[in-house]
């Protein structure tokens, strides 16, 4: 197992399953902190953008003074569900992009409403066994740029991708006991 004890990972703490992300990160040995301010953001080696409602999260990023700092944050980022939407440089339906850090186009709520949430065994590139992916009002990636690597698809739709030190998944890895997605994210710190 890798040693992540020297790293501090932030979890943007505006909405979403913050405590669940923190628990998974700490399970792997890294220090995890909730990020609500610029001073907290400046302490971290990497950042998780959790699920939530992306438009509300954008408003909260602006009101907290974090928006511009997040746009220029150049360390590893894992975006889950709404975090994926925040990372996209294009959103279907004409909505303006949020942080626009990844060359991807995203369809919001692509798998239906809250009642249509589901869990499925997902084959992820580099994983020997399927990952128990939890999809809740999940988006999917409808277009990728040439520099984006597809890590997983479900029913022909891209649901996990990588661009440089950015990982974006449509599902919620923090809602399972399987830490492989978070470990893949933490491995970005060693590259």
From Swiss-Prot:
Disulfide topology: none
The keyword Hydrolase is annotated on this UniProt entry: yes
Example GO molecular function: pyridoxal 5'-phosphate synthase (glutamine hydrolysing) activity
InterPro entries xrefs: Class_I_gatase-like, PdxT/SNO, PdxT/SNO_CS
The protein's Enzyme Commission number: 4.3.3.6, 3.5.1.2
Any Gene Ontology biological process: pyridoxine metabolic process
Keyword Lyase attributed: yes
GO cellular component: cytosol; glutaminase complex
Catalytic site positions: 81, 172, 174
Pathway where it operates: Cofactor biosynthesis; pyridoxal 5'-phosphate biosynthesis
Signal peptide stretch: none
Catalytic reactions of this protein: aldehydo-D-ribose 5-phosphate + D-glyceraldehyde 3-phosphate + L-glutamine = pyridoxal 5'-phosphate + L-glutamate + phosphate + 3 H2O + H(+); L-glutamine + H2O = L-glutamate + NH4(+)
Entry keyword set: Glutamine amidotransferase, Hydrolase, Lyase, Pyridoxal phosphate
List of residues binding L-glutamine: 52-54, 108, 136-137
Subunit note: In the presence of PdxS, forms a dodecamer of heterodimers. Only shows activity in the heterodimer.
UniProt function note: Catalyzes the hydrolysis of glutamine to glutamate and ammonia as part of the biosynthesis of pyridoxal 5'-phosphate. The resulting ammonia molecule is channeled to the active site of PdxS.
Protein family according to the UniProt entry: Belongs to the glutaminase PdxT/SNO family.
Name recorded for this polypeptide: Pyridoxal 5'-phosphate synthase subunit PdxT
Gene: pdxT
